[in-house]
Amino acid sequence: MTLYFGKRSEANLETAALPLQHLMRQALAINLIDFSITEGFRPRFKQDEYFAAGKSKVRWPNSKHNIQPYSEAVDAVPYVRGKLSYNYYHCCFLAGVILALSKKISVPVRWGGNWDMDLEPITDQDFNDLVHFELYK
């Protein structure tokens, strides 16, 4: 079975920088796990809402989701058994696929489960955003 993004994921992905679009499309084409792109560019009202709710640690315009004309971040959420899954294991599996591919095709990204980019993901973080992937320079 060949996986493909739905219309909403495609629309969200098209708001992101081309290297991220390329990475996410190739990650889906590997056919190891289905996933959706729930966000690319994030407008001010939504960034403010996420900050107030503790879902983001940064205010507008300091998130890589807030960069225009093309966002430097996407939220990629596993799609399992016909629905979005924020399950820890599903998110970590997807992150492994995306991070390995990012190294292979030289599109450096930082994952929201390893903000400090060390060799200890998740356990040494005080804020995990397991569906967040951003271009890293």
Regions found by a protein language model. Give the residues of each.
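Structured catalytic/translocation cores of nucleotide/phosphate-coupled proteins
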Residues: 22-23, 27-28, 32, 45, ...
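Catalytic cores and adjacent binding grooves of peptidoglycan-active enzymes
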Residues: 63-137
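Polar low-complexity intrinsically disordered regions enriched in Ser/Thr and small residues
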Residues: 9, 57, 115-116
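Extended, low-complexity, intrinsically disordered C-terminal regulatory tails
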Residues: 26-55, 104, 112-114
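Active-site acidic/histidine clusters and adjacent loop/turn architecture
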Residues: 1-36
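Cytochrome P450 catalytic domain signature, combining two hallmark sequence patches
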Residues: 54-64
